[in-house]
Design a protein with these regions (language model features):
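Peripheral (often C-terminal) accessory segments that flank ATP-dependent C-N-forming ligase machineries
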Residues: 121-221
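Structural signal for hydrophobic packing residues in well-ordered secondary-structure cores
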Residues: 65, 69-73, 209-212, 216
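ATP-dependent carboxylate/phosphate-activation module, predominantly the ATP-grasp catalytic core
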Residues: 7-13, 17-69, 76, 98-126, ...
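A short linear hydrophobic-aromatic micro-motif
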Residues: 2-4, 132-133
């Protein structure tokens, strides 16, 4: 009988995203999650930011991802991948990998860095169009999704700055009643931001969260 066993694993969660073909990683980025995918249960934001190339974990997670990709069967055409790892000090533990684009604003973040849309590239590669027009940016990128809280949404004032690259917010949400986040991708507001390095990105994420919390008004039950 086939069995699957799960165990609790210590560590912070990182993800590696990119494109793979013929045992070669064509393009990739390494990011660290800000909070985790269960954050919606406490109505706290979820996001991630790209780590610096000089960060030793960047190479270590690249090597770990390539090792996984070359051990599993993959199609002949280019595929996107989204891999996740636990990192506990020097210990790296493989969590999972999928031949798909990661959620949240991972695709937007990757495109801002490389000029490559992972979703479109995946579709094109399946019909024989395998051309990558890579234009690497000096910007580091991050994203943050803010789930709804409990109550009727009365008003939202969105943050604006030169480093805010994109904001997703549905204006028709005003007046709607919420009971908090429902799942990991619950997002009332989502920001795509850019910065100079991972510390800069972390500070900007914290700034947006604090500012948005004061500028999103609910009428409690």
């Amino acid at each position: 009988q086939n069995l699957m066993v799960e165990t609790f694993t210590n560590g912070e969660m990182y993800h590696v995203d990119g494109l793979f073909k013929d045992n070669e990683m064509l393009l990739y980025s390494v990011s660290k999650y800000f909070n985790d995918c269960l954050s919606f249960k406490t109505n706290t934001p979820l996001g991630s930011y790209m780590i610096d190339d000089s960060n030793p974990l960047s190479r270590k997670l690249y090597d770990a991802t390539l090792k996984v990709l070359t051990k599993i069967p993959t199609p002949n055409h280019t595929i996107p991948f989204h891999a996740e790892f636990f990192v506990d000090g020097e210990k790296v533990t493989f969590c999972e990998i999928a031949s798909r684009v990661g959620g949240g604003l991972i695709n937007d973040s990757f495109k801002l860095l490389t000029n490559i849309d992972l979703q479109k590239t995946f579709v094109k590669s399946q019909i024989g169009i395998d051309y990558l027009n890579i234009i690497k940016s000096d910007k580091r990128t991050a994203w943050i999704t803010i789930p709804p809280k409990e109550g009727e949404l009365l008003s939202v004032n969105l943050y604006k700055d030169s480093w805010v690259e994109k904001v997703n917010f549905d204006e028709t949400s005003i007046g709607r009643r919420y009971s908090g986040g429902d799942y990991s991708a619950s997002a009332l507001i989502a920001y795509l931001i850019s910065g100079t390095d991972e510390d800069d990105l972390k500070n900007k994420i914290l700034h947006i969260i604090e500012w948005q919390d004061k500028n999103t008004i609910y009428k409690e039950k």
